Amino acid sequence: MSAAPGLLHQELSCPLCLQLFDAPVTAECGHSFCRACLSRVAGEPAADGTVNCPCCQAPTRPQALSTNLQLARLVEGLAQVPQGHCEEHLDPLSIYCEQDRVLVCGVCASLGSHRGHRLLPAAEAHSRLKTQLPQQKLQLQEASMRKEKSVAVLEHQLTEVEETVRQFRGAVGEQLGKMRVFLAALEGSLDREAERVRSEAGVALRRELGGLHSYLEQLRQMEKVLEEVADKPQTEFLMKYCLVTSRLQKILAESPPPARLDIQLPIISDDFKFQVWRKMFRALMPALEELTFDPSSAHPSLVVSPTGRRVECSEQKAPPAGDDARQFDKAVAVVAQQLLSDGEHYWEVEVGDKPRWALGVMASEASRRGRLHAVPSQGLWLLGLRDGKTLEAHVEAKEPRALRTPERRPTRLGLYLSFGDGVLAFYDASDADALELLFAFRERLPGPVYPFFDVCWHDKGKNAQPLLLVGPDGQEA
């Protein structure tokens, strides 16, 4: 117990304020603090209702904190000792023990537990240790700066999480909202179709039913007549019989055919579900971009309409290209005036029965002069048609990748670009109600891009058909 007096003051001091405990409480982890100090440092409880211990960061429940009466009594007893005196010997604390880093009295230093330790007079220790304060203060400031940076990073991350969740919820709400609108419209359309079929079938069947009731009534009447004729005398019987049988044969000959009604309603099958999904997929696409061709970029052989939504290759000899770096001088191509740099975009191009073309995007920094090398590493992501038969994806290879031949040649192409997801997808948009995926590049684009259109040479009129940009109203130029 001889070691206790020198350290008792430290043991009964709050690790936060470094003063003797005032209303001490003990956390669930075992560390003790002044109640006021813990409340000030721990701050507001987390979502689970706990606060972190300032010493070990272990969670503790504020409601589990209660005054540590044993500590409080020890502090009360220690407070009776005159300040600056040994708790055990009541002598002045005049010597500093460097080994244990505590003030001790002469008895503790010469006879007690600090005998043989590195000892200094209190005055000398005061002067020496005071010179260390600036360095310790600097270390404290550096530690504070590091933690403040950590706090700033965490607060920024928290803000990013909140913003990401907000955007996610917004996107989910928007997409599901579109789905609900689409499905509600589809349900209404199918319900109206079912009601139309029910109404028309009801009218037709009631008409047939009325005819059958009338015919059955005639048969019943003839049955009564036959019963009446059977009881007639010979001469009258024979005269009536001929008339009755003649009438009966006529009625039987006029017998209406069995009622047949072909009810045409969609069958709720897997194919029906797939078709609904295809239609809904199109409905979820972003709104059509309002693109226009950039005349300043067009090859000299190309003619751009005044509306900027139609371009074709002229069969007349064109003048040579100028020195404008924005203009294509070899490729019979043109880009849109609109630069795309982020978000989602969707546009459609009417290609009709044009046998040769290429569509996609071009990096804003890619060169438009000379022969173009249509691969992603050169800033071009393209899908094209060759010889009116073969669809080709211009991937990173010596030759374009030939795709499977579609059942029908697309007459309208839909292009979907998502910078966030790193997707450039090409769809057959010929069907006004559905999209069919033809090919997709799945890589993040290095920067802004322009929608790109390779019209290709007119080939003596064989490839003279124009390319048409579809406007937001769904109509070509």
From Swiss-Prot:
PANTHER family, alphabetized: E3 UBIQUITIN-PROTEIN LIGASE TRIM
Assembly information from the UniProt record: Homodimer. Homooligomer; disulfide-linked. Oligomerizes on the phospholipid membrane. Interacts with DYSF and CAV3.
Coiled-coil region(s): 135-232
Superkingdom to which the source organism belongs: Eukaryota
Binding residue positions for Zn(2+) 3: C86, H89, C105, C108
EC number(s) recorded for this UniProt protein: 2.3.2.27
One Pfam family per UniProt: SPRY
Protein name: Tripartite motif-containing protein 72
UniProt KW keywords: Cell membrane, Coiled coil, Cytoplasmic vesicle, Disulfide bond, Exocytosis, Membrane, Metal-binding, Phosphoprotein, Transferase, Transport, Ubl conjugation pathway, Zinc, Zinc-finger
Pathway membership, UniProt: Protein modification; protein ubiquitination
GO CC annotations on file: cytoplasmic vesicle membrane; sarcolemma
Zinc fingers typed RING-type, residue spans: 14-57
Subcellular location: Cell membrane, Sarcolemma; Cytoplasmic vesicle membrane
Chain residues that bind Zn(2+) 2: C29, H31, C53, C56
Binding site for Zn(2+) 4: C97, D100, H114, H117
Activity regulation text: Specifically binds phosphatidylserine. The binding to phospholipids enhances ubiquitination activity.
Segments forming domain B30.2/SPRY: 271-475
Modified residues (Phosphoserine): S255
The reaction(s) this protein catalyses: S-ubiquitinyl-[E2 ubiquitin-conjugating enzyme]-L-cysteine + [acceptor protein]-L-lysine = [E2 ubiquitin-conjugating enzyme]-L-cysteine + N(6)-ubiquitinyl-[acceptor protein]-L-lysine
Function: Muscle-specific E3 ubiquitin-protein ligase that plays a central role in cell membrane repair by nucleating the assembly of the repair machinery at injury sites. Its ubiquitination activity is mediated by E2 ubiquitin-conjugating enzymes UBE2D1, UBE2D2 and UBE2D3. Acts as a sensor of oxidation: upon membrane damage, entry of extracellular oxidative environment results in disulfide bond formation and homooligomerization at the injury site. This oligomerization acts as a nucleation site for recruitment of TRIM72-containing vesicles to the injury site, leading to membrane patch formation.
Note on domains (UniProt): The RING domain is flexible in both the dimer and oligomer. Binding to the negatively charged phosphatidylserine lipids is mediated by the positively charged PRYSPRY domains and is inhibited by Ca(2+).
Entry PTM: Disulfide bond formation at Cys-242 occurs in case of membrane damage that cause the entry of the oxidized milieu of the extracellular space, resulting in homooligomerization.
